[in-house]
Curated annotation (Swiss-Prot):
<keyword id="KW-0547">Nucleotide-binding</keyword>
<feature type="binding site">
    <location>
        <begin position="136"/>
        <end position="139"/>
    </location>
    <ligand>
        <name>GTP</name>
    </ligand>
</feature>
<feature type="domain" description="tr-type G">
    <location>
        <begin position="10"/>
        <end position="203"/>
    </location>
</feature>
<comment type="subunit">
    <text>Monomer.</text>
</comment>
<dbReference type="InterPro" id="IPR033720">
    <property type="entry name" value="EFTU_2"/>
</dbReference>
<keyword id="KW-0963">Cytoplasm</keyword>
<dbReference type="InterPro" id="IPR005225">
    <property type="entry name" value="Small_GTP-bd"/>
</dbReference>
<comment type="function">
    <text>GTP hydrolase that promotes the GTP-dependent binding of aminoacyl-tRNA to the A-site of ribosomes during protein biosynthesis.</text>
</comment>
<keyword id="KW-0479">Metal-binding</keyword>
<dbReference type="InterPro" id="IPR050055">
    <property type="entry name" value="EF-Tu_GTPase"/>
</dbReference>
<feature type="region of interest" description="G4">
    <location>
        <begin position="136"/>
        <end position="139"/>
    </location>
</feature>
<dbReference type="InterPro" id="IPR009001">
    <property type="entry name" value="Transl_elong_EF1A/Init_IF2_C"/>
</dbReference>
<dbReference type="InterPro" id="IPR004160">
    <property type="entry name" value="Transl_elong_EFTu/EF1A_C"/>
</dbReference>
<protein>
    <recommendedName>
        <fullName>Elongation factor Tu</fullName>
        <ecNumber>3.6.5.3</ecNumber>
    </recommendedName>
</protein>
<dbReference type="GO" id="GO:0003746">
    <property type="term" value="F:translation elongation factor activity"/>
</dbReference>
<keyword id="KW-0251">Elongation factor</keyword>
<feature type="binding site">
    <location>
        <begin position="81"/>
        <end position="85"/>
    </location>
    <ligand>
        <name>GTP</name>
    </ligand>
</feature>
Amino acid sequence: MAKESYKRDKPHVNIGTIGHVDHGKTTLTAAITSVLAKSGMADAREFGDIDKAPEERERGITISTAHVEYQTVKRHYAHIDCPGHADYIKNMITGAAQMDGAILVVAGTDGPMPQTREHILLARQVNVPALVVFLNKVDIADPELLELVEMELRELLTEYGFPGDDIPIIKGSALKALDGDAEGEKAIMELMDAVDNYIPEPVRDVDKPFLMPVEDVFSISGRGTVGTGRIERGRIKINEEVEIVGIRDTRKSVVTGIEMFQKLLDEGQAGDNAGLLLRGVDKNDLERGMVIAKPGTIKPHTKFKAEVYILKKEEGGRHTPFFTNYRPQFYFRTTDVTGAVSLPEGVEMVMPGDNLSVEVELIAPIAMDEGLRFAIREGGRTVGAGSVTKIND
């Protein structure tokens, strides 16, 4: 059977369920698909089917993630759900599943729990733009308790830098919705309405300022130097000015040719594997780890703060803890750069399996923005992953 072509008639948004273990994230994911399936907007997915999430590898780390797709009248959604708490942490830090927004699931019977806090903090650290709350299990919770839970949640969200007073909190029962109960289904439709209206439509990569990490460098006799790579964001046209950023001093050039699969193009855009011919650039001036970008849009830095996850021994990580001044390689986009790690005050050492905030100083500058992801490696083996949360130089 021929594959259906992907229709681009609605804006696409990536979303995920986050929250404490057993608060109903996977049940809610199944309930959304079963309720939307009734109007032909989704294929209903069983709880067990979502819970047996396949393993994926992202930046050398194995993560179990379930991917579900559905649509509303307004949008097309790709929804991720992770079976285990560690999978969530790894997912959010590696950016394996880039979230444009998230549904925070909280059981009305328990209220916010330790992982609720941790997921809100991580969502803040890795720049998840917006959250909507689903207060679950309200059919078996005390109504007076629910009011307190809602107040506590709004305070918690505000504490972590989200607009706690404005975030929609939808009350319902995912299990009842899954069983076809009318009240239960109504809450799911309310939730989807809140997600449609509250989670902002993401800016498409192609509309962001141009950036291409350099993967390889060639020289064409009589014509000049070509940098190749996959365009990460934006568009580039012939005769546009660019900057070459990272490793060494920033320099300007002009793109005099764009090639893709041996064909000449007028324009390259996000997602294209392209070769850019650069005026006045020597082959030795360009190397892996640099980026070619729209002038003034990205700067090179060596010092930053990051949220990191350190692999457990069973995940192929280190067998021993590390201490302040640990010097691994940080793999950004296409290259490794050595850096020194400083631990926060009061933290003596970091054990395999930990996640925490650290400060890093690289030996060479890398083009970076807040939110840039990286792997932490020792001799080519991945031992952790991270996301830049603040630039310090």
